[in-house]
Amino acid sequence: MAWLQPTLCRKELESRQTSGLDAAMKAAGKKYFGTALTVRNDAGETNVLNTKGEFGSITPENAMKWEAIQPNRGQFNWGPADQHANAATQRGMELRCHTLVWHSQLPSWVANGNWNNQTLQQVMKDHINAVMGRYKGKCTHWDVVNEALNEDGTYRDSVFYRVIGEAFIPIAFRMVLAADPTTKLYYNDYNLEYGGAKTAGAIRITKLIQSYGLRIDGVGLQAHMTSESTPTQSTVTPSRANLASVLNSFTKLNVDVAYTELDIRMNTPANQQKLQANAAAYARMVGSCMDVKRCVGVTVWGISDKYSWVPGTFPGEGSALLWDDNFNKKPSYTSSLNTIRACWKCHRLLVSIS
């Protein structure tokens, strides 16, 4: 039996059908390259989504959030969520489901209800059981709890924390495990990529869940980044090595990691210099996942700049995704694909041949 050296390993991987992001990721030993999606009637978006090997996972952008699914107590709106589940099934893609317990996009009847510990837990359980029952066996991953932390690593003020305390987090994980033990369970948050107090807070949450004897399969780092200093974010995307170090701070706790909502914004309008800097930032993000064995995949938060949430939330900023408004691939697409194909750390994925 012979072992391929890194250069030969790259050739072996490139000889496979790695013309798309997901195909290249899988050839390099990862699970998926995915996208967030809002189902709509746009031929350009559909064409990209249907391109073989481009995406292997779909995350419903908004359709599975509490406000969308159960706007009034006991009244469920399954239509949009079902559309996304069907979109994944029809294309043979994984369905990365998002999200069950979150302070935002929460209907007022939950956020402003007169709850005590017992009654709010019952509301959580009823919602989780209904949603998990509907999509049992379809969701490969669930963001169980989303954005429970402030920037300084303390707990965010939410109805769940005010009424139940930090225990609402392991309680939610216990409920989800009981409803569907086959799905992968994640804690998901933003600004974890920098290795500061908020990262330490997410490590604390991971240990808290484990201290209850419960399973947490992974931590999702949302990765809403910038490729240059902007009015809303002065710190640009860190180095590849620093990003990998943060990922490893979680994997040391015996959990997987993933970039779950990746986009990298800039001050608009874009120009070639900014697009190249953006491409380099994407290479650092994707490359850091390639460098960490238990980084299972990358999800970008949308296909095209045409529908990105960024300009509406951060005026004067944008051009954050891999396709432009007209569904043309940007330099960031090429840099991401080339980074995956380069098969960094390939010597750890040695391919045996007879």
UniProtKB/Swiss-Prot annotation:
Influence of temperature on activity: Optimum temperature is 40 degrees Celsius.
Subcellular location: Secreted
Glycoprotein found in the keyword field: yes
EC number: 3.2.1.8
Main location (coarse class): secreted
Glycosylation sites: 117
Pathway: Glycan degradation; xylan degradation
Coiled coil in keyword set: no
pH dependence: Optimum pH is 6.0.
Disulfide bonds: 289-295
Domain GH10: 19-339
Induction: Expression is under the control of transcription factor XYR1 and highly induced by xylan.
Active site per the UniProt annotation: 147 (proton donor), 261 (nucleophile)
Catalysis: reaction(s): Endohydrolysis of (1->4)-beta-D-xylosidic linkages in xylans
GO CC term, one of those recorded: extracellular region
Keyword line: Carbohydrate metabolism, Disulfide bond, Glycoprotein, Glycosidase, Hydrolase, Polysaccharide degradation, Secreted, Signal, Virulence, Xylan degradation
Recorded GO MF terms: endo-1,4-beta-xylanase activity
GO process annotations (BP): xylan catabolic process
Biological function: Endo-1,4-beta-xylanase involved in the hydrolysis of xylan, a major structural heterogeneous polysaccharide found in plant biomass representing the second most abundant polysaccharide in the biosphere, after cellulose. Plays an important role in causing fusarium head blight (FHB) on cereal crops.
Protein family (similarity comment): Belongs to the glycosyl hydrolase 10 (cellulase F) family.
Protein name, per record: Endo-1,4-beta-xylanase 1
Species of origin: Gibberella zeae (strain ATCC MYA-4620 / CBS 123657 / FGSC 9075 / NRRL 31084 / PH-1) (Wheat head blight fungus)
